[in-house]
């Protein structure tokens, strides 16, 4: 095999591999999954903003100005800072306020997704319920069905 044949061989293999990849990537499930991941990432940003910019300030106002993201417990005596960022620089801290915020984010995402999926399931169920039943067969169709069934049983007219 000379070098020209080798190049052609690799071009054919590469072309086949590229075609297989394109076919795989263009399947509905893969494209749907990619769209879902992108929308999910954007939705995560919305929920993070909802928690950080709307819900937590309301909770903070109700609790007298508490900022949960800066709540921590020092695990080292050398930690004397008042903010989480500074405390982390000084030593080991248990950042339970940040954990509380992240947990709240998760619970809100889970609740919203549950509500969306529940609504979609209800819409799907309503669509199935509103489907019209199949039309009743005409008299001619009933007779033809009876004849077909009799022929299947072998009970046709005898000669």
UniProtKB/Swiss-Prot annotation:
GO cellular component labels: plasma membrane
Principal place of residence: membrane
Annotated compartments: Cell inner membrane
Molecular-function GO terms, alphabetical: mechanosensitive monoatomic ion channel activity
Transmembrane segments: 35-55, 97-117
Membrane topology listed for this record: Multi-pass membrane protein
Keywords on record: Cell inner membrane, Cell membrane, Ion channel, Ion transport, Membrane, Transmembrane, Transmembrane helix, Transport
Function: Channel that opens in response to stretch forces in the membrane lipid bilayer. May participate in the regulation of osmotic pressure changes within the cell.
Quaternary organization: Homopentamer.
Annotated NCBIfam families: mscL, PRK00567.1-4, PRK13952.1
The family this protein is said to belong to: Belongs to the MscL family.
UniProt name for this protein: Large-conductance mechanosensitive channel
Organism of this sequence: Rhodopseudomonas palustris (strain ATCC BAA-98 / CGA009)
This protein's encoding gene: mscL
